[in-house]
Amino acid sequence: MTLQFALLIIVSIAAAVLAAMKWHAFASADLDRLRQQEHWAGQFSRGARVLLNDDRVPKPLLETLARLNRYLLDPEACFLLYNVFTQPRGAAHPFTMAPEEIALHETHPELAHAIAETLFAGLMAITYTDLRWGERARGAMARRYRGEAQVTELAVAAREVVRSDH
């Protein structure tokens, strides 16, 4: 009877150790997610603050920044973002920019780059609102924008941030 009791104690201890290891792995992954979300939300916040004070930024873009800001803490936004990036691209129809956006890109390329970085940071922050859907959303974004120069440059910078965090 004492051998069975000792075996039961050993099995219980092993199960407790395995459960603690699994919990630790989850907690570490969630802590990494929160660090990344804090980084990208900070980047977005700094960029948005600069853009809000710039009179050259079109009003529709400011409204987009406000919408992104609302989604920063919404885990459902991560799932919705995943759905957007996994939808097949429809029939190619011409993309047209508003005249004020064209003028902005032509006359103020540095501002256009700041806008792109801020929007990218906002999207990245949203992808870190949920551990599981965030990984899927980032993967879908990478597949969708593979090879596009500016997005690739920003993604490399994002990868460097992830590496420096570990």
List the model feature ranges, each with a label:
Residues A41, S45, L62-A66, Y82, ...:
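Generic detector of well-ordered alpha-helical segments enriched in charged/polar residues
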Residues N69-R70, Y82-N83, V162-H166:
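Membrane-interface module
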Residues F95-H166:
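Cytosol-/stroma-facing membrane-proximal "stalk/adaptor" domains immediately downstream
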Residues E76-A92:
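Short, charged early-sequence alpha-helical segments and their helix-coil boundaries
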